[in-house]
Amino acid sequence: MSYMVARMQKMKAGNLGGAFKHNERVFETHSNKDINPSRSHLNYELTDRDRSVSYEKQIKDYVNENKVSNRAIRKDAVLCDEWIITSDKDFFEKLDEEQTRTFFETAKNYFAENYGESNIAYASVHLDESTPHMHMGVVPFENGKLSSKAMFDREELKHIQEDLPRYMSDHGFELERGKLNSEAKHKTVAEFKRAMADMELKEELLEKYHAPPFVDERTGELNNDTEAFWHEKEFADMFEVQSPIRETTNQEKMDWLRKQYQEELKKLESSKKPLEDDLSHLEELLDKKTKEYIKIDSEASERASELSKAEGYINTLENHSKSLEAKIECLESDNLQLEKQKATKLEAKALNESELRELKPKKNFLGKEHYELSPEQFEGLKAEVYRSRTLLHHKDIELEQAKRQVSLRASKNYFTASLERAKEKAKGESIDRLKSEIKRLKNENSILRQQNDKMLGKLRELMPDKAFKNLLSELKAIKPIVNIIKKAIEKSLF
């Protein structure tokens, strides 16, 4: 749970000028490095005071108008008690803008109800520093008299430290009681901020790093035993002696944390050798796989080249087949033309034979029959016989060509069918084998990657960030292997 912080500082006339300039941000440049000028417009005032009037003039006018004495205000009089109201960063991170404003208004109302609404001179809320806080000026004016000692004595300050957190809790803000203001009331603003920083450091060491909150001075042992602490404290308070168990200082917590880190570093050193061995084994395995990938890539390239050559040869044969097909069609056309010519010749021959039948045989003196031909008829007969022989010779040639064409067509059909079967078989076997090999390599690569991720996880837990980043940089050199695998897969599939 967060603490309620309420710290008071007495303000005389000489202090109010600087307080006014600081709270209203009238400086062009700030010596306070905590101020973020880009957020100063988010600051606001919870009273209806005229913000152009200085605190000193406002408070003196108020006192002079309401005092019962005619005496002038002493030059060294405490004109105002400024309260800084805040909590830790974690508390405000859980609140939105409206809830933050309600928190400060509630704190202001507590002082207004207990010390007079008219005595609240200013209530300036700052949101432009590391932690939201309120500077609230309470004029210690009561019964017509100005007296800081009368309004805020030691007992009243203790009462506020007890009562204010309770009041805030009743209004929905769960806060623990802070340190007694009487111990810190004379602190400067810088000292107060250092105290706040120490408080935040303490909470971070306890909550984030789990530093031990208590130390037993009898043994020097650090522990987390809250029950033992309060038991010893109650016993010591009863007999008015100092408890042997006290809260650890921030320095003791940091020393403990440093020791924990040193022990962790020793563990890292002891586990470094096995990790280096594992890493060496992984590097050997990666080297082996790299060689396998290169080999597969080479084989895939060879297979791709063979497939390319086979496809080129197949394309050549297909072109040759198309050429043969065209020749066969041409020969068939020529054969048809020859058949027509043959029929014409047969008709012509039939006519010539008819003429020959008209020739009548004659008998010679021996009584034998013979044909007498005129020179023209003889020459015509010779020519006809020559043409017939020539035609028969051509027909014999054409018949042989036709027989060869029939055989060629059958061979072409057989070759085409065989070629298609060979093509499918070659492609199927090569692609199936390559796919199988690629699948095997993918599985091995997946297993290797899982082992690698597991090892990197262990290294991340055990190694310092810088050493781990250096290791990652070295492992990035293995990335070209991935490119080799991708190329092998692409060449195998396409």
Swiss-Prot record:
GO molecular function: DNA binding
Database matches in InterPro entries: Mob_Pre
GO BP terms, alphabetized: DNA recombination
A Pfam family it matches: Mob_Pre
Keywords from the named record: DNA-binding, Plasmid
Binding site for DNA: 44, 115
CDD domains referenced in this protein's UniProt entry, alphabetically: MobM_relaxase
Gene3D superfamilies xref list: 3.30.930.30
Note: Contains conserved positively charged amino acids probably involved in the binding of the pre protein to the RSA site.
Function statement: The interaction of the RSA site and the PRE protein may not only serves a function in plasmid maintenance, but may also contributes to the distribution of small antibiotic resistance plasmids among Gram-positive bacteria.
Family: Belongs to the plasmid mobilization pre family.
Protein name according to UniProt: Plasmid recombination enzyme
Annotated organism of origin: Streptococcus agalactiae
